[in-house]
A protein has these predicted regions:
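Beta-strand-enriched accessory nucleic-acid recognition/scaffold domains that flank the catalytic cores
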Residues: 1-389, 395-396, 402-674, 679, ...
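Cys/His-rich microdomains that often coordinate metals
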Residues: 676-677, 690, 694
Length: 716
C-alpha cells in the first residue's frame, strides 16, 4: 500500500478481535524475543490476509509441507554496477539463481495455478503431478522429503498434496516447527486464500510502449508490419461484429460481464441505439489513443511464470545438486504456442533491455508433465530470470510469437547482458511503536518509481531513438536506482551517484517527456513533451490511423419493447414520480463523488445501488413498473444518448426481460451478428461465407496452439 500512497487503518477493538488470526499465533513480543525483524516487512506480511482474496474452501493444511528452496549455479556474463562509484564492469562469473523463489506446487487433479495468501505465506502455486512423477522416476525409498525444520515426510503415506518452499513462508524462523504453525493455523481460524487464478481462456494481449521503445533501430517497414493488426482492429470497430463485441467485452469468455455487455450478447440489435453508438465512438477513440501510446494488439498472452518443476523434483527427491530438468538453456514451455515457435518473453516494468527470445519446446514429454497449466516454464540452466528481473511468486510474462518483433528484439539484444548490482538487506531489530512510525513515514517519503521510469523513457527516445553507449549506461544506472527505490520501504536505503555521473544522467533527463506521452500518459502537448522525433515509439504513434466509424448493416432493427416486462404497465409522463426522480438523480449524482480513482469499477458503484433503491421507494411502484417506465421514456420520448444510469441501476432486470423476450427469436450468426432462420439444428452460421470464416479462425487457433498431448494420446 505504501507504493500506491494508500493507508489502511483498523479500529483497535476490531483489530484485536482478529489479531491472532492475522498473525497465526505470533505476537510482537514473541517476534522480539527471537531478535525482531524489519518493521515494514512485518506490516507488509501482516496485510497478506487483508488483500482481496477468495477463500480456498478445500485447502487442507495437513496435506501441506514446506521445503527448502532450490538454487542453481549458472555461469554467465553480466554487467556489474558498483553502487559506490557507479562503475560498470562486464564479468563472467557463477551466478546463483533462486529457481523457486516464491513458488510451490500442488498435485491435486483439477487444481488451477493461482497466487495464494495465508498468514505469513505468499506466492504462486502451480499444478504439477509430483506423485505421478515419483512413481515413474523414483524408487519408493526416495518418496520422502525433509521439511525446513528437519522433519521427514512420506509423500504418499502422509497424503501430501501441496509442497511450498521456504521463500513463500516469510516468518518461518519464528516458529519452532511446521507442526506448531499448523496447530496455530487451526486454533485461530486461519485459512488459505487466492487472489488471482489462471483463467480457462487467456485472450490475446497488447504490448506497451516500454517494451517497444527498447527496440531503437526498428525500420519503417517493421513498424508497418507490427501495427498492422492494430490498424485493422481500429478500422473494424463498428463495422465488424466480432471485433466490436470483443472490444466491448461482450464475449462468452468474459466471466464478469456488465449488464450492458450481457445484453449485447443476447440482443445485438442494441447496437442500433444512439447510446451504444456513442459507446462505440468512444471505444474507437480510446483505441486510437491507446495505440498511439504504444498499446498494440499482438500475438501474445500474459502467462504466469513457473520454474521447471521436473528439475525441482530431481533436486528435492533424487538429491541431484545439478539436475537436468525437462528444459535446456534457451528453451521455454507453454501450451499456448506450438513446438519450435520463437517466443519473446517480456515483463513489466520493462526498464533496461528485457527481451528474452527463447524457443518453445513442446513434445509428448513436456506436454505430459507441464501441459496441465497455461504457465510459461523457464529452464533452470537459463539466466532468463535475471534478464526479466523476476521471481516466481506470481509474476506474469507477456509471451509473444511475432516474427517481426523477435527479429528486431534479437538484433537489439546483441551485446546486451543482464545487469547485476548489490542491494542492501532490510534492517532488522526490535519492533516498537517508534520503529513502526519511523519505518512507515520514511517509506512514504522515500521516493516514487514513476519519475525514474519516465526518465528512462526520456533517455531511450533521445537522439531520435539512436542508442549510444553512454545512453545504455545511463539506462543501466537508472534501472539500478529504480530497484533501490522499490526496496526502499524495506531497506530505507538508496545510493547517490558521484557528481560526474549525476551530470551525465541529468544531460538526458532534464528534457521534457517524449512526444508520444501525449497519448500514453495524457501529458499536455504544449508544455510537457518534446517535439516528435524519429524514435521508434514516436514513429509508431505517427503511423496509427484515425478513420471514421462505420456501422454493421447486418444487425437487425432495435425493438425497444424487448427490454421490458410485457405483462406490466408503464408510464412516460415526465411529471410521474418515476421519471421525475430519475431526472433529479441525473443532475444530482455528483453527491456520490469518488474522485478519479482508477481502481473503482464505475458499473458496480455503491451509488447506483442507492439511486435505484431511492427511485423505487420514491415512486412507490413495483420494480418492473419502474424499469418499464424508464426504458419506454429513454428509448421513445427522450431518446437519450446517455443511458449509463439506467443500465447501471436496472441493467440486470433489463437483461432478464431480454432473456424472456428473445427466447423465440431466430439465432444470431456469431460471425456477422445477423439473425437467420436455420435449415436445421446443425446450422450455426447464416451463410457459407461466415462458415468459411469461422472454419479459418478455428484452423488458425489450432495451428498456433495444438492441443496438449496427454493420457491416451501419448500411447498412439
Amino acid at each position: 500500500m505504501i507504493r500506491t500512497k494508500r493507508f489502511m487503518a483498523v479500529r483497535e477493538k476490531d483489530y484485536l478481535a482478529v489479531e491472532q488470526t492475522l498473525m497465526c499465533g505470533l505476537t510482537i513480543d514473541s517476534i522480539n524475543a527471537l531478535g525482531g525483524m524489519n518493521e515494514n516487512k512485518l506490516l507488509s506480511y501482516k496485510s497478506l490476509m487483508a488483500s482481496a482474496t477468495d477463500r480456498i474452501e478445500d485447502f487442507d493444511i495437513d496435506r501441506c509441507i514446506v521445503v527448502d528452496d532450490f538454487e542453481m549455479p549458472v555461469m554467465a556474463e553480466s554487467d556489474f554496477i558498483d553502487y559506490t562509484d557507479y562503475s560498470i564492469t562486464r564479468k563472467t562469473s557463477e551466478t546463483i539463481i533462486a529457481e523457486t523463489d516464491g513458488w510451490g506446487m500442488c498435485c491435486k487433479p483439477g487444481f488451477k495455478t493461482q497466487i495464494v495468501r495465508a498468514p505469513w505465506i505468499k506466492g504462486l502455486v502451480s499444478y504439477f503431478d509430483f506423485r505421478g512423477w515419483l512413481k515413474e522416476y523414483c524408487p519408493a525409498d526416495d518418496w520422502t522429503v525433509i521439511d525446513i525444520y528437519g522433519k521427514e515426510w512420506k509423500i504418499l503415506e502422509d497424503d501430501i498434496q501441496y509442497i511450498l518452499t521456504k521463500s513463500m513462508f516469510k516468518l518461518h524462523k519464528f516458529y519452532p516447527s511446521w507442526l506448531c504453525y499448523k496447530s496455530n493455523f487451526k486454533s485461530y481460524g486461519c485459512y488459505f486464500g487466492c487472489c488471482k487464478v489462471e483463467e480457462d481462456y487467456i485472450p490475446k494481449a497488447r504490448i506497451n510502449y516500454q517494451m517497444l521503445q527498447s527496440l531503437s533501430d526498428m525500420t519503417d517497414n517493421e513498424i508497418e508490419r507490427l501495427i498492422a493488426k492494430t490498424a485493422d482492429e481500429i478500422d473494424s470497430v463498428g463495422r465488424d461484429y466480432q471485433t466490436t463485441m470483443r472490444l466491448l467485452g461482450a464475449t462468452e469468455y468474459n466471466q464478469t460481464k456488465s449488464a450492458m455487455q450481457e445484453a449485447l450478447t443476447i440482443y445485438p440489435e442494441l447496437f442500433k441505439d444512439v447510446y451504444n453508438r456513442e459507446l462505440l465512438k468512444q471505444t474507437k477513440k480510446s483505441l486510437v489513443k491507446q495505440a498511439k501510446g504504444g498499446r498494440l494488439r499482438i500475438n501474445g498472452k500474459y502467462l504466469f511464470i513457473s520454474p521447471d518443476p521436473v528439475a525441482f523434483c530431481e533436486w528435492l527427491f533424487k538429491g541431484e545438486q545439478f539436475p537436468t530438468g525437462i528444459l535446456e538453456n534457451g528453451e521455454v514451455y507453454t501450451n499456448q504456442f506450438k513446438d519450435g515457435d520463437e517466443l519473446d518473453c517480456l515483463r513489466s516494468p520493462h526498464l533496461y533491455q528485457e527481451h528474452a527470445v527463447r524457443i518453445n519446446k513442446r513434445n509428448e514429454l513436456t506436454d505430459k508433465w507441464l501441459g496441465g497449466t497455461k504457465c510459461v516454464y523457464f529452464s533452470c540452466h537459463d539466466m532468463i530470470s535475471r534478464i526479466l528481473q523476476q521471481d516466481f511468486d506470481g509474476d506474469i510474462s507477456l509471451v509473444v510469437k511475432d516474427r517481426t518483433l523477435t527479429t528486431v528484439a534479437k538484433r537489439n539484444m546483441q551485446g546486451i547482458v543482464p545487469l547485476s548490482y548489490d542491494l542492501k538487506k532490510a534492517r532488522g531489530g526490535i519492533i516498537d511503536a517508534d520503529r513502526l512510525y519511523e519505518g512507515v513515514s520514511t517509506a512514504y517519503t522515500g521516493g516514487s518509481i514513476g519519475p525514474i521510469s519516465n526518465a528512462i523513457s526520456k533517455v531511450k527516445n533521445a537522439n531520435g531513438g539512436k542508442m549510444t553507449d553512454e545512453q545504455i549506461k545511463v539506462i543501466a544506472w537508472l534501472t539500478m536506482k529504480n530497484n533501490q527505490i522499490i526496496d526502499f520501504a524495506k531497506t530505507l536505503w538508496k545510493s547517490e551517484p558521484p557528481k560526474e555521473i549525476a551530470d551525465i544522467i541529468k544531460k538526458y533527463t532534464k528534457s521534457k517527456l517524449p512526444n508520444f506521452f501525449i497519448y500514453a500518459k495524457d501529458k499536455d502537448p504544449d508544455t510537457q513533451v518534446e517535439p516528435p522525433n524519429n524514435s521508434t515509439m514516436n514513429r509508431i504513434s505517427a503511423k496509427i490511423p484515425a478513420s471514421r466509424i462505420l456501422y454493421n448493416n447486418k444487425i437487425g432493427k432495435l425493438d425497444w419493447t424487448m427490454l421490458i416486462n410485457k405483462s406490466v404497465d408503464y408510464t412516460t409522463r415526465e411529471n410521474s414520480p418515476i421519471i421525475e426522480r430519475y431526472n433529479w438523480w441525473i443532475w444530482n449524482q455528483h453527491r456520490f463523488d469518488y474522485g478519479d480513482d482508477p481502481h473503482i469499477n464505475e458499473d458496480d458503484l455503491y451509488k447506483y445501488r442507492c439511486i435505484a433503491q431511492d427511485i423505487v421507494e420514491y415512486s412507490n411502484e413495483p420494480l418492473d413498473v419502474v424499469v418499464n417506465s424508464l426504458v419506454a421514456y429513454l428509448y421513445t420520448v427522450k431518446k437519450s444518448s446517455n443511458k449509463k444510469m439506467l443500465w447501471a441501476c436496472f441493467g440486470w432486470t433489463i437483461v432478464e426481460n431480454l432473456r424472456i423476450n428473445t427466447a423465440q427469436l431466430n439465432p444470431i450468426c456469431p460471425i456477422c451478428g445477423k439473425r437467420f432462420k436455420p435449415r436445421d439444428v446443425c446450422q450455426h452460421y447464416c451463410s457459407e461465407e461466415c462458415y468459411k470464416k469461422a472454419d479459418n479462425q478455428r484452423r488458425t487457433e489450432s495451428r498456433e496452439a495444438p492441443p496438449v498431448r496427454t493420457g491416451d494420446m501419448l500411447k498412439q
